Amino acid sequence: MLDREGFRPNVGIILLNARNEVFWGKRLREHSWQFPQGGIKYGETPMQAMYRELHEETGLHPEHVKIIGRTRDWLRYEVPDKFIKREVRGHYRGQKQIWFLLRMVGRDCDICLRATDHPEFDAWRWNEYWVPLDAVIEFKRDVYQLALTELSRFLRRPAQRAEKPRGPRLSRYPRVIGVQAQQTLTIVDTSVVCSEIEVEASTLDEMPPHVIVGK
């Protein structure tokens, strides 16, 4: 379903935790990261599409999140021809999106990347709200910046925690536990949660250092 200008109606989701960090998903078998997003089906409202895409891509249900805000109007990005199927070139130009800002009220363990038979992501992590967008595919970076900027007015200060005595500084570099070929690997990093995929030890060097694999 395209509009007259060749843009497909779509929703984008910025999911916050209590620390105002945002959910990033690593695209299946790729090295790029992105926010959940997806097309609006015929007869759906943007909100209905948002809840459907949220569940399909993260496994979360409406009771796991709270809507904080949304963009006032559509934000658009064009897709380069090399990423467009040949049969729709000349008609399809890109996506126009309504972006929703959600706060997660559930737990990290409620997130499931295999909620459907066709997962979009094979890993996920929490990132700072204003993290550089270098890991995002280039043609989406401008619309991400627009959405983050417009929705930043809804941010609140994270809850203050009682200061604890400082212990030894933990390394942010991952460590590997029980690495054996043909077995599930678990890479531990305090800023990342696990994906749900099995890999061989030989593929470890190809993975970005902040991904956890295994369950």
Swiss-Prot record:
Its cofactor is a divalent metal cation. InterPro entries: Nudix_hydrolase (IPR020476), NUDIX_hydrolase-like_dom_sf (IPR015797), NUDIX_hydrolase_CS (IPR020084), NUDIX_hydrolase_dom (IPR000086), RppH (IPR022927). It comes from Burkholderia lata (strain ATCC 17760 / DSM 23089 / LMG 22485 / NCIMB 9086 / R18194 / 383). PANTHER family: ADP-RIBOSE PYROPHOSPHATASE (PTHR43736), DIHYDRONEOPTERIN TRIPHOSPHATE DIPHOSPHATASE (PTHR43736:SF1). It holds the Pfam family NUDIX. The lineage of its organism: Bacteria, Pseudomonadati, Pseudomonadota, Betaproteobacteria, Burkholderiales. The keyword Hydrolase applies. GO terms for molecular function: pyrophosphatase activity. The gene is rppH. This is RNA pyrophosphohydrolase. A motif (Nudix box) lies at residues 38-59.
